[in-house]
Amino acid sequence: LINRQILSKPIFESYFTEEDYGDSLGLESWERIQYLDNLPEGIASQMAESAARNKLIVETYKEKQDEYGQTIVFAVNVIHAIQISALFNKAGIKSDFIVSDIRDGVTGVTVSREDNERKLEAYRNGELQVLVNVNILTEGVDLPKTKTVFLARPTVSSILMTQMVGRALRGTAAGGTSSAYIV
């Protein structure tokens, strides 16, 4: 499929922080994470609010912006999506976020299906360089010009991982790109 340009050639990149998440969790907690594919709220919050981790994501994109092209970031939770998108915009990178319909008492942000559709259209039209999302762009959305995905949320689900990676793998014969970055 790659040779026929139906799929993009994947280029995998990994970046690391010195942060550890879940060191204090016992075996039962780790088994629960694997079974439910859901992080405990404390770990999700720690990841979402990590200034060093979020800065690394934005700086990595900024350094390779020409190579990465249009990018989807898979965030840990709503707060993470809002923070990452704000950091991208502060760095001069046009970004927005999409999440499920919410009215968040903590952040005061209301997002509707119409808001998400408007943001998706802006991304499709090239008005946004980065689209940050929480559990929305894993399936059923056609964004063929996506060249890079940042997997900023963990998963143990091979199905979810395949769906996230697949957002960038549409090849030129299918209206996409010749190569795709999985970060």
Regions from the PLM with identified roles:
Residues I11-Y15, L87, G140:
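Intrinsic disorder/low-structure terminal segments
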Residues L1-R4, I82-S85, R167-A173:
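Intrinsically disordered, low-complexity boundary segments flanking structured domains
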Residues K94-V183:
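Conserved RecA-like P-loop NTPase helicase motor core
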Residues P40-N133:
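Conserved C-terminal RecA-like helicase domain
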Residues G22, Q83, I159:
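Short acidic, gly/pro-rich beta-turn/loop elements at beta-sheet edges
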Residues L1-G69:
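Interdomain helical connector at the RecA1-RecA2 junction of SF1/SF2 helicase-like NTPases
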Residues S24, E28, T71, T107-T110, ...:
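Compositionally biased, intrinsically disordered low-complexity regions
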